[in-house]
Design a protein with these regions (language model features):
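N-terminal, active-site-proximal structural segment of metallo-dependent hydrolase catalytic domains
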Residues: 2-176, 189-195, 287-288, 382-386
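Metal-dependent phosphoester-hydrolase catalytic domains
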Residues: 32-47, 52-83, 94-97, 210-211, ...
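Structured beta-strand-rich core segments of catalytic domains in phosphoester-bond hydrolases
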Residues: 100-121, 138, 148-149, 158-254, ...
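Active-site-proximal beta-strand elements of phosphoester/diester hydrolases
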Residues: 123-135, 231-240, 269-272, 276
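Loop/turn elements at helix/coil->beta-strand transitions in domains of secreted/extracellular proteins
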Residues: 124, 155-157, 230-232, 298-301
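Active-site metal-binding loops of divalent metal-dependent hydrolases
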Residues: 129-131, 163-164, 239, 307-308, ...
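Sec-exported extracytoplasmic/periplasmic mature domains
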Residues: 152-156, 179, 205, 295, ...
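A solvent-exposed, charged loop/short amphipathic helix patch at secondary-structure junctions
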Residues: 249-275
Length: 386
């Protein structure tokens, strides 16, 4: 009898301990999940703040001028939380999902997805390409220039180029190709020996105007072209460059690869942020000037192209696109990185249009790598009048 009571006591104690362990484990698990939920909420709030930071003028908010650069990091972190909740507590999925829902506008701006739709008959092809001085003539002693060959193959109806400056030999070679492709063209320079942008068109160019803004080396030009009975405004832009040197880009690549440590990372990071912020402050009034020009001509048919030197989550992109349709967001797919030099992959080249145009199959073509930019092109079809 005593032995039986002792056995019952042992069983009871073991049961109590198991219950205590279960309770303790449950408490630890609950605390851990609450901790993860808090971290997820913090990630969502930061993601939202950064996603809508493109409303902030860099001149007034210097520190946040380039916050958009880290937006994809928080998108990815939030996605990792989504996977975690699916594995451990499905109700928690609501946190990252609501984050993406509230962040829909910047999310779609940064990485759009659209159902592909072939361009209809009558659509015109528009291409914008920072040609990096045609990648330097000395690189191609055989006389074959991939960028010119690519342009010839694309057969764009309207072509806007940035960094199109060449020497006398280069100019002769460019002209020998482009004169056969386009009857109408114009070039403009920020100053003698400075940045050069160019437009080539299958339609007559009837006027040209420089959009005035402060810059030592960059510029925007507005043209009127005549297509049938329509007069279309074409705006070609090359906004303030980042000013990053080869050494700066090399430092950035080293940071990404983890080749720098400790104070070296901190020093290089501060230096890069300072340079990028300085460029953003210069770029903001340029973007404002372009946006004012667009606002002044609301109701007109407008196609705007160029190298903004700023990401989709930026003040420059936001203010210029306010009264226009971003053709890549409307008809492109994926992040569409158009700059690829020095370990930096960002979409900084754009095609936009007024509401009387419908964009189709906007694409950043990564097949040609001779410039530090990839070309972006799109088909545009005039909408029928209501």
């Amino acid at each position: 009898m005593i032995v039986l009571q002792q056995k019952r006591s042992v069983v009871f104690l073991r049961t109590v301990r198991r219950i205590e362990n279960i309770i303790m484990f449950g408490s630890i698990r609950k605390f851990f999940l609450q901790l993860i939920a808090g971290a997820n909420l913090a990630t969502v709030f930061i993601m939202l703040f950064i996603g809508y930071s493109d409303r902030l003028d860099p001149v007034k908010h210097e520190v946040l001028a380039n916050a958009g650069l880290v937006f994809p990091i928080f998108l990815l972190v939030n996605f990792c939380f989504l996977i975690f909740w699916l594995c451990f507590k499905k109700i928690g999925v609501l946190i990252p999902l609501l984050g993406y829902i509230f962040c829909y506008i910047p999310l779609r701006t940064y990485i759009p997805f659209n159902i592909p739709s072939s361009p209809p008959d009558g659509a015109i092809k528009v291409m914008s390409y920072n040609v990096w001085s045609f990648a330097g003539w000395e690189r191609f002693p055989d006389g074959k220039f991939p960028i010119l060959e690519y342009i010839r193959e694309q057969k764009a109806d309207i072509l806007c180029l940035q960094e199109a400056l060449t020497n006398e030999i280069g100019k002769a070679r460019v002209d020998s190709v482009m004169d056969k492709l386009y009857q109408y063209r114009d070039t403009a320079m920020s100053r003698p020996g400075g940045d050069c942008i160019a437009i080539y068109s299958r339609y007559p160019i009837v006027s040209r105007e420089r959009i005035q803004y402060p810059s030592k080396g960059n510029l925007s030009m507005a043209y009127e072209i005549k297509k049938g009975n329509d007069t279309i405004i074409i705006v070609n832009n090359h906004l303030e460059t980042t000013g990053l040197s080869v050494e700066d880009k090399s430092s950035f690549k080293s940071i990404v690869k983890g080749n720098l440590e400790g104070t070296a990372v901190k020093k290089a990071s501060y230096h890069l942020v300072d340079k990028l912020s300085e460029a953003s402050i210069k770029r903001a009034p340029q973007a404002d000037a372009v946006a004012r020009y667009v606002s002044k001509h609301l109701g007109r048919s407008i196609i705007l192209c160029g190298d903004f030197n700023d990401t989709p989550i930026s003040y420059a992109h936001h203010v210029i696109s306010k009264n226009l349709t971003d053709c890549y967001v409307e008809s492109g797919n994926g992040p569409g990185f158009s700059y690829h030099e020095g370990g930096m992959y960002v979409r900084i080249d754009n095609i936009m249009c007024s509401s009387d145009w419908e964009p189709f199959e906007c694409k950043v073509d990564s097949k040609i790598k001779d410039s530090d930019h990839y070309p972006i092109f799109c088909w545009l079809k005039k909408r029928g009048k209501p």
